């Protein structure tokens, strides 16, 4: 009986600490910072010939920061610093796939970060010449964010050549370049990325974006039905509800509201965007 009471008390205390500590942390502790690393040459000297180990330490420190910052404290991560750390880690060890995968998962939907991210992936592609993931990531970045389908097709073709057994590339190629449906291509891309992502926090963030794209596609299909039925385009998403094609406008996982633009496209006030701090100094120069 005493053991049961003791166990209950311990469990209650544990639950209280787990729930109350984040509030205490947010109120009294300063925001978690990712400290800027010294130049790559200095890191190389500090590694004493163990560049791969130094790169791995930087990667795990960055991943821990991201998990603590986003998953536990629910604060906005310093994505520019995160990129800088991963860039220097791959300067030390350009074969480290963890850095490239993590960078793609964290930065690929932040449009101002794409030129930096692509340079990082290009660096990896020069060394990991057998790895189909890197041209696959580059293809997605050029298509979805930079709106350069020809460039995207080049990288997708390379990814297909490196991994000829995958049916994903045929699906993406059809949706990107023949059917012209960017939303469906994005859904296919995210499902593939989620399937292969090991980091649970990144998987959660990608799943959130997937949910948003699925909501957009749901509305796009309803708009197509409306136009087919009434021989005219809907003026607002509310018309879909009035016509009985959908019960209600789905919520945006990012907290915004979906709306219909003048040219008939579904957008959201949240822009599905993450933050990227602009700084005068380019971290690539270090």
Feature-to-residue mapping (PLM):
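Low-complexity, acidic interaction segments enriched in glycine
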Residues: 109, 123, 185-286
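Structural signature of tandem alpha-helical TPR/SEL1-like repeats
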Residues: 78-81, 111-120, 146-155, 182-185
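Alpha-solenoid helical repeat scaffolds
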Residues: 87, 122, 156-157, 191
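Extreme N-terminal leader/anchor segments
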Residues: 1-50, 71
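Amphipathic alpha-helices of TPR/Sel1-like and other helical repeat/solenoid scaffolds
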Residues: 34, 38-47, 75-95, 114-128
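TPR/TPR-like alpha-solenoid helical repeat scaffolds
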Residues: 62, 136-144, 168-181, 200-218, ...
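Amphipathic alpha-helical repeat scaffolds of TPR domains
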Residues: 50-71, 92-108, 129-144, 165-176
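TPR/TPR-like (Sel1-like) alpha-helical repeat modules
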Residues: 157-164, 174-200
